[in-house]
Amino acid sequence: MDNNEISSHQPVLLREAIQALAIRRDGLYIDGTFGRGGHAQAILAALSSEGRLLGVDKDPAAIAAGHALAQKDGRFTIVQASIGDLARVVSERGWLKRINGVLFDLGVSSPQLESAERGFSFLRDGPLDMRMNPTVGQSAAEWLANAKEKEIAEVLRVYGEERYCRRIARAIIQARELNSLTRTKQLAEVVAKAIPRWERRMHPATRSFQAIRIFINHELEELRAALEQALAALAVKGRLAVISFHSLEDRIVKRFFREKARGEELPPDLPVMQKDFQQASLKVLGKPIWPVPEEIAHNPRARSARLRVAEKQTY
């Protein structure tokens, strides 16, 4: 792990995320998507010697960066786990209902995209992997080698909102009959040929790579689980801040915040009064926050980012 990688990575909506967390100097915080530690270092800077920060990530490279930070700052600990396993991580530390803030910065990180060996980018030729943790589960190449045409099309439609999902799926099946699809450039070329030229407002492989990555890593399922578990782990008045990068993620976060802010209606025949049945609820704090033009100019990856923030109201 290059120690410069932590400082060179540009965290998105950094100032806005730190403000949103309203950090208590002696508080307990979780960075649920540690990455290369950009947000984590800013949180630590706002904490006193009594404050604590737990970083969570399943990427081995992120864990290595986290260990480097932990050696320099005893207030920080890193754990290799998925955000969907947050409940276990919190319970093991006795932090349940004590956490003052949780931050999720969703999606793939810049270092992951920039590393050809990770297989996330259609702009760099590398193994067709796409796993956040390359030691767990099947790679994109392994899945594409065995998936049926209908399944591939459905993944592209649901997770990539790709209108040409059937054409692309058919092209993938035809291509793999000739040669195994094991490289990112191979897949990108197959997808590009399946999409009409007049539809190429962005790179033709963008949606397909997003869809396959989300599917391979179970990203949306883990996000739904993580939101519920984060709410349960927060102390009253604790903050939940989520940075998303595409509509699928943001839709889930928006719906979760709205449902928890509204509360759930109890069945009329339940033998308890509604007022006596406390449920964990959220107060949505303002509208989504977008990057300012200056940040987008400095870091183009930030252009699609949005930050939603909510505060826990009751146990």
Swiss-Prot record:
InterPro entries: RsmH (IPR002903), SAM-dep_MeTrfase_MraW_recog (IPR023397), SAM-dependent_MTases_sf (IPR029063). It is found in: Cytoplasm. GO terms for cellular component: cytoplasm. Disulfide bonds: none annotated. Keywords: Cytoplasm, Methyltransferase, rRNA processing, S-adenosyl-L-methionine, Transferase. Transmembrane segments: none annotated. Its EC number is 2.1.1.199. S-adenosyl-L-methionine binds at G37, G38, H39, D57, D105, Q112. One of its GO terms (biological process) is rRNA base methylation. Its main location: cytoplasm. It catalyses: cytidine(1402) in 16S rRNA + S-adenosyl-L-methionine = N(4)-methylcytidine(1402) in 16S rRNA + S-adenosyl-L-homocysteine + H(+). One of its GO terms (molecular function) is rRNA (cytosine-N4-)-methyltransferase activity. Belongs to the methyltransferase superfamily. RsmH family. Specifically methylates the N4 position of cytidine in position 1402 (C1402) of 16S rRNA. This is Ribosomal RNA small subunit methyltransferase H. It comes from Nitrosococcus oceani (strain ATCC 19707 / BCRC 17464 / JCM 30415 / NCIMB 11848 / C-107). The gene is rsmH.
